[in-house]
Amino acid sequence: IVRCCSATCKXSCVCCF
């Protein structure tokens, strides 16, 4: 699992917010 912190967080990742 990858951690995405961008506003367009999607796909196989977990948002930081």
Curated annotation (Swiss-Prot):
It is found in: Secreted. Expressed by the venom duct. Its main location: secreted. Belongs to the conotoxin M superfamily. Disulfide bonds join 4-15, 5-13, 9-16. Keywords: Disulfide bond, Secreted, Toxin. One of its GO terms (molecular function) is toxin activity. The cysteine framework is III (CC-C-C-CC). Coiled coil: none annotated. It comes from Conus regius (Crown cone). One of its GO terms (cellular component) is extracellular region. This is Conotoxin reg3m.
